[in-house]
Amino acid sequence: MSAPAAPQYKVDVQKAVGFQPAPQKVVYTSRDLMLYALSIGVKQDELKFLYENDAQFAAFPTYPLVLGLKKDTHGVSVYGGGGKEDVPGIPAFDPNKLVHGDQSIEIFRPLPLGGEFELHTTVSGVYDKGKGMVIERTTKMVDPKEPSKPYSSMKGSAFVRGYGGWGGPKGPKQDSYDPPKDKAPDAEYEDQTNDDLAILYRLSG
């Protein structure tokens, strides 16, 4: 069944917000951690993220952000772009209209160097932006044996172009972090990324 045309689109916000799908199993190893570090540009002078025998070997703190796409596979994940949300109150939409929006992460404790974990997700907001719809989710990475002690909490949003105008809430005003006026930077840092980072990043999920 194809997605309805945008003018007929209607979201039931009360059904959607607060929905929690089944926990998602995720698996990773120390090799996955090192591949991720390489894919975000970590250099060889930061061996604590790149070499498993380093005395301070650790996971790069933002690694949980890719686990929702990696899931529990050790192969290459194929992302179909969505379109069928399986969220009560959100009808199907054209997946080609979906783009990534905001992303943030809060770290509560150091990540283990590998193992099996779960992602617990809640639909925390659905907003009508006029020209499109924003779907916001909050996801916690937990050990299934200790679900009350998350390692991290991630908030992400997706913007679906052309699916607005259904009379829903506009959503809260976004925080603005404009640089101070009439003040020079305290420090400046310049770095050159490699051309192949996107190819490496894809392998992390």
Question: Which ranges hold each PLM region?
Answer:
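HotDog/MaoC-like acyl-thioester-processing domains
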Residues: 2-22, 98-189
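Hydrophobic, proline/glycine-rich low-complexity stretches
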Residues: 2-116
